[in-house]
From Swiss-Prot:
Listed Basic and acidic residues bias regions: 11-20, 28-37, 500-509
Expressing tissues: Embryonic stem (ES) cell-specific. Not expressed in adult, except in testis.
Pfam families according to UniProt: SCAN, zf-C2H2
Name of the protein in its database record: Zinc finger and SCAN domain-containing protein 10
GO biological process: negative regulation of DNA-templated transcription; stem cell differentiation
Zinc finger (C2H2-type): 292-315, 321-343, 349-371, 377-399, 421-443, 467-489, 495-517, 523-545, 551-573, 579-601, 607-629, 635-657, 669-691, 697-719
Keywords: Activator, DNA-binding, Metal-binding, Methylation, Nucleus, Phosphoprotein, Repeat, Repressor, Transcription, Transcription regulation, Zinc, Zinc-finger
Disruption phenotype: Knockout results in high lethality in male and female mice, with most homozygous animals dying before weaning. Knockout 14.5 dpc embryos show facial asymmetry along with inner and outer ear malformations.
Species of origin: Mus musculus (Mouse)
InterPro entries named among the record's database cross-references: SCAN_dom (IPR003309), SCAN_sf (IPR038269), Znf_C2H2_sf (IPR036236), Znf_C2H2_type (IPR013087)
Amino acid sequence: MLAEPVPDALEQEHPGAVKLEEDEVGEEDPRLAESRPRPEVAHQLFRCFQYQEDMGPRASLGRLRELCNHWLRPALHTKKQILELLVLEQFLSVLPPHVLSRLHGQPLRDGEEVVQLLEGVPRDISHMGPLDFSFSAGKNAPADIISEEQNSPSQVPSHSPQTELPSEEIPALHPLNELPPPQPAPIRPAEPEEWRLAPSSNWPMSPEPQEILQDPRESNPSQGPSWLEENSRDQELAAVLESLTFEDTSEKRAWPANPLGFGSRMPDNEELKVEEPKVTTWPVVIGAESQTEKPEVAGEPLTQTVGQETSSTGWGGTPADGSEVVKVRGASDAPEPQGEMQFICTYCGVNFPEMSHLQAHQLQSHPNLQPHPSSRSFRCLWCGKTFGRSSILKLHMRTHTDERPHACHLCNRRFRQSSHLTKHLLTHSSEPAFRCAECNQGFQRRSSLMQHLLAHAQGKNLTPNPEGKTKVPEMAAVLCSHCGQTFKRRSSLKRHLRNHAKDKDHLSSEDPGSLSSSQESNPYVCSDCGKAFRQSEQLMIHTRRVHTRERPFSCQVCGRCFTQNSQLISHQQIHTGEKPHACPQCSKRFVRRAGLARHLLTHGSLRPYHCAQCGKSFRQMRDLTRHVRCHTGEKPCRCNECGEGFTQNAHLARHQRIHTGEKPHACDICGHRFRNSSNLARHRRSHTGERPYSCPTCGRSFRRNAHLQRHLITHTGSKQEKEVPQECPECGKSFNRSCNLLRHLLVHTGARPYSCALCGRSFSRNSHLLRHLRTHARESLY
């Protein structure tokens, strides 16, 4: 079946077969023969072909047929049925898993039938006889495909009639998920060699013309047995391999060592069990080395135990991650020892002796590239991220569950990773862990030492402080391109850039053209309100806080619930009285670090946020945002009960207590309760007699700041300052307070906004209504 038949014998057996091929091939154009790739180059192109979505299945099949014709030359060496069979098996091996899954359970006979199935075209049952697919799965081969011994280089190969199967008698093709079990094949007597086993791979290769298979050592004795020699043919092959290695698609991790063994890429390959070791004959391969190198000489039989092969490389002899496996030959003619396998990364070309080393290299050097379909990956069920190791996935899951198993025994602070705890413990140690060899300055972290050594390397002046230690100069490593602010660390710059991104996202909501860029920067979108976030944790917190109102973290002391575990931890410091954050200038202590940061701004005069309308400056961006609402009149916070709007959410929460009647703040002396803490503070001054607001001119003190401001008007020197310009538009009467003017306007309008709920009588002032209600109270007593 695989040997080259003698034309006379073939004409006697099948008179029309050879004539059909001759009619189809015809006279070949010499220019086309020169332009087509050489057989070994076409072989590499055929094996390394990858399926592309833009080409489609029909164009991919046509390209494979063209490459296989250049490689196998079916008019000279093989039957058309064998050519179609090789094309079919390679076509199935390059199909992606989601396309290959559509062919499960379908009896495939040729490549055209596969294309019709993928394109949805009804199949023609009488198209052609089925082709044998038993040896193309990479696990077993027909019994007649064996290595044969070459008697003489000049001998014309003969063909045995028993080895050829007519096309109409070839057994039917089994479905992909019902591959037939391998059958042991007897070894036949040696015949003139035309197919043999290549020592460098398990790829089946077709026989080439005699001049191509000539031993390179015979033509040039100085050259070694390597197939990449310094000649024109090898230079052409090396150029093709280099382009395939570094200019291929980003989806390919490495070349498979045995593309025929596509069974390792099947989704249902777990069902293929090996019950007992069976001896099979592997597909033999035509190599590019000398024809005189026979497996029998090296003492290697052509049969191999299935159990041994699958335990090392998987089904079909393919590595687990599909990386390229080659055997490196030296310059000498000595036989290569077994086990010298090299795994090559097709992105950078680095060689590794073991597969685990290659996988670790790809995880570290190429982390952003998508893994090979057959490589192991661990996916997070929360956000969908994939990881190469289960330990990394376990650490990532703690960001969703907020689990912090590592606790500090000194301050009870908890961390997700043990490395973070180790860095934290250095802050409690008085002895520095790292010291500078030049100035003997100590540091708790290696990064601080490296920054200090960088200052030494740049030749900066390190002035000693009074304690004898050198002071590291301030180094601004990164600069914000938007506002010009500098940061020491790149992580701080990334957090700062999010503030600019928020402003861009707000502007992009008004510009529909920039919606796509906003979705790329914020991939996690809330299904309720459409708000987008950069991280899944932010989306989870937003859903709990705004939509579901879920508060899974509760305080065991007071029962108060929180949406985040960090809020619960900071709240528990209120019960313990712990205030770990102290101001270095006034020694005032705070429970939270954010409170200390806000307090530190009060000591400085820096107010970087300015109002564009009135020029007023603020220390924080949120204060400026609240102030701008005074100019625009925007009141985004509205009450669901009465519809009244407020500029701040805190004002809305305080207003809602009027509807609910909640008074959470109680006086510990008289028990009187108040809605706001400020009212409680003013009430306590009535018990203590405290008057914190004093006049700097006369020394008179007041309980409220408003009373002090009213009193200061009496000390102003000019009459214009005494008379506040609040005049009545009806009668021209002036008032020093706006509330008095509003009360006076009720006289002109006749409005009585305060009505009694019992008798319906209305009043212009609230004090009059309260006085009227007392009459009803007296009536109820009698």
